Swiss-Prot record:
Cellular localisation: Cell membrane
Keyword Cell membrane listed: yes
Family: Belongs to the EhaA family.
Provenance organism: Methanothermobacter marburgensis (strain ATCC BAA-927 / DSM 2133 / JCM 14651 / NBRC 100331 / OCM 82 / Marburg)
Protein name as catalogued: Probable [NiFe]-hydrogenase-type-3 Eha complex membrane subunit A
Keyword field: Cell membrane, Membrane, Transmembrane, Transmembrane helix
Signal peptide from the UniProt entry: none
Domain of life of the source: Archaea
Assembly behavior: Putative multisubunit membrane-bound [NiFe]-hydrogenase eha is composed of at least 20 subunits.
Length: 98
C-alpha cells in the first residue's frame, strides 16, 4: 500500500504546517493570475507538495517519528516552507519568457 493509514496523520500535519508556516513567512496564499503562467511560489503550491514528499521519503527510509508521524509532518512542513520561501528560485529558476 502506498499510503499507510498509520502515517496519514503525518501527511495531513505536514500539509497544514507547511501552509501555516508559509503564510507566516509572507508567501501569498494563491499564485498571481493567470495561474497557469504564474511562477510565484505560494503557500498552497508547492510547499504542501514538498512536505508530503519529505514525509514519504522519511517513511520509506524507516524514519517514522515518535507520535505516529505527526512530529515528522511538522518538521517536514517547516523544512518545506523554508525551502519554498528562500531556496525555491535558486533550485528552479524562473523561465526566460515569463
Amino acid at each position: 500500500m502506498i499510503i499507510h493509514v498509520t502515517y496519514l496523520s503525518g501527511y495531513i500535519t505536514g500539509i497544514i504546517s507547511s501552509i501555516i508556516i508559509s503564510a507566516i513567512l509572507g508567501l501569498p496564499l494563491a499564485p498571481e493570475r493567470p495561474a497557469r503562467h504564474s511562477w510565484t511560489p505560494s503557500a498552497i503550491f508547492p510547499a504542501p507538495i514538498i512536505a508530503m514528499g519529505l514525509v514519504a521519503i522519511c517513511i520509506k527510509l524507516g524514519v517514522t517519528g515518535m507520535y505516529g508521524g505527526v512530529d515528522l509532518g511538522v518538521v517536514s512542513g517547516l523544512l518545506a516552507a523554508l525551502m519554498t520561501a528562500y531556496f525555491l528560485e535558486d533550485i528552479f529558476p524562473r523561465p526566460e519568457d515569463l
